[in-house]
Amino acid sequence: MSSSDGGSSRVSIPYHLRKTLQKIREYTGKQHSDEDIFAVYKDSFNDPHETAQKLLFLDTFHEVRSKREKKKEPIVPVTQPSGRGGRRNFASSNSYQGSGRNASFKRENGANHVTRGSRTAQPATNKASNITVPNETKVSGPASIPSEVSNHKAQDDPSLISASRCSSKSDQAIEIETASKQGKNQSLPKPDVSEQSHVTFPFHLQVAKGLQNGLTFGSFDSNFVKEVSSSNGASGGYDSNFESSHGTGDDERESSPTTNGITGVASAREETSTVSEDKDYGISNSATGAEPVVHSDHIVPPVEEVPKEEALSNTETHQIAYGQEAPLSVFGLVPSLSAIGQPVNTEAAETQPGNSNSPPISLVSYPPDQSSIAAATQQTNFLRQQYPPNFFPYGYYSPYYMPPPYIHQFLSPNGIPQQSYFPQGAALTAPSHAKPVDNTENPPTTNPYLHTSPMVASSIPSTTTLNSIHSEEKASHLTESAAAWIGQGFGNLQVNPMYNLAYQGQPLGFPVVQAGHGGLMGMHQPTQPMAAASTTYQTLPPPPHTTTAMGEPIGHPHIAYQQPQAALTNWVNNY
């Protein structure tokens, strides 16, 4: 491996660098050859430290070549496969006749068009590989020559074709096509086409011929659309390709103008591969210039219709993808016209040449001006409201419930206060003819809460009597002792937890019921009380603090308790 063995090194290593290379090998601990170390040493700009670091991360079996070796080697893409028929191989003929490694590399990457087209015989190993792998035997002439060249004819078993017959037919086809193209002054394709390899498709996938002919790695651009559309023109490129691939004569081959040279190669390969896979088709090609006769029960579409339909769908699909930007031209948000129910223009598909038998296709390529006008008809309001009309985003609801007449601006978005359930106190004005008098005697045990008024202590009065008592008591306490009766004076206030008012002497269970009626006015409908509600309240036991002396103003809050009782009776009459 080293250069000290004598003559094994292909690169001359200076004598003063051999010790340095030996030290680098000892430092790395890997058995790299002197050529590898010297190549890394040159790449590292003669820095031994960087060379050692690179060799530490370099595998021992990794092949390191110098720049001089790389220049001598032919430019062959290593990572590109051969495809279905080995369409692409761009190495020269001398590289095929080189060492065994190069020959195996060529065998992996597919057939070399130039060398296999010109060779009259092949080795036995290559013939065996061609028989087992039918992809390499179906190769036509060189891919760089724009023609419809075929070196095979469809037969029942293409593996029985001899190598000499293939080579002679390919040589004859190359000479005829070269002469015809020189007579028409058609130049060869640009070299940038040959720098890309075809996209490979499996045998079990039925791919359109337009994709097989023009699809290469990196070919998705505007030129690809033009090439496919030109091959589908009024000159009938696919018809001429099919005729020339079956050998219809020299005159017909000369009268078939095509601009895409790969079309004939792929079409011939597709026809041959189709016949080799489907053994049911018995195609007789004994006579030159005869059309293929199908002896089978299978229904095969006509030859002239299938390529047209496939090429039409292919061309229109790519024209939509690359030829125009509508119907998604309005900020990328407007859907297509066919998706929203707009009429789709199908005249463009009908006016194309060779499309009389094809069904109407919904995907039609619109011109840029027509599609932009159609998309502009949709009314798009960019200054619309964020919320629907029935949504009020500025209505704030506080954590606790607040009645409508007081802070209505937080509860309703329109700012109009809602009507309160209770009538105002000014409307209930009546002449005061009775006043509550403090009782010095003990109150009766059967009706303890009505002991402040001797008129109502005996029995339940009528509705008019209660209304008059309610009005006169409110008027009397508002005028005489308003400072001591704040809770009763503002009787129209709706009781709720916001005010935190603790009335003197009120029972604990009853104000909760009143607060529920008044505070939850807008949320709950008031229920109609029973007729015997007053008798129910009279049977309640008295609170403990009512047994105190009656000389103090403790007895007055009992009148405040009597007022809501009259209000309940008013609800029954007004309802």
UniProtKB/Swiss-Prot annotation:
Skewed-composition ranges (Polar residues): 90-102, 115-138, 161-171
One Pfam short name: GIP1_N
Compositionally biased spans, kind Basic and acidic residues: 268-281
Domain of life: Eukaryota
Region Disordered, residue ranges: 66-171, 229-296
Subcellular location(s) per record: Nucleus
A cellular component term, taken from the record's GO annotations: nucleus
Keywords linked to the UniProt accession: Nucleus
The keyword Nucleus is annotated on this UniProt entry: yes
Tissue localization of expression: Expressed in roots, leaves, stems and flowers.
Cross-referenced InterPro entries: GIP1 (IPR044277), GIP1_N (IPR009719), UBA-like_sf (IPR009060)
Family, per entry: Belongs to the GIP1 family.
Its job: May act as a transcriptional coactivator of LOB domain-containing proteins.
Designated name of the protein: GBF-interacting protein 1-like
Species classification: Eukaryota, Viridiplantae, Streptophyta, Embryophyta, Tracheophyta
